[in-house]
Amino acid sequence: MAKKILFVGFGRSGKDTAGEFLAEHCGLRYGGSTSWAALPLMAEFLKVHPMVAWENRHKNRELWKSHCDELRKDDPCRLIRLALAQGDVITGVRGLPEIQAARKESLFDHIIWVANPRVPVDPTVDFGIDECNGVVVNEGTLEEYHRKLAQMAAFAFSAENFSPYALKLL
């Protein structure tokens, strides 16, 4: 059974890049973000085409956060489960109740905080590094970030499905 990994952190820190790297180079399936899982519901709420909702999500961060909180009111893991149905690695959890419920239900083998000193504190994330069981720092080049991700993945699970690129980074 594949490992389940959640990457969290402030907006634009490199969470999606981490998920995409593990999918492309480490043999895991990337399920996208919880925002992606919420997209059809958000587009319906906003009464716009999903493409318009997605393209404007960063301009509407607080609205997305508040409506996604409403969507999760009765089931904190609702969006997490939707994303996990698409893959083993997901990103984008922003609420403390989500993290706590996911831990209680043992939905993930690893919850990794992506720390990036180049991005500002994100007010839509209401928990911190202390809720995670690992950290990866994204502060250099893309190749340096990939190296850290490959090393983390090799430590967390087998490297038998790694691409030649990921193996070279070890």
What are these regions (language model features)?
Residues 26, 105-107, 130-132:
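Short, structured coil segments at secondary-structure junctions
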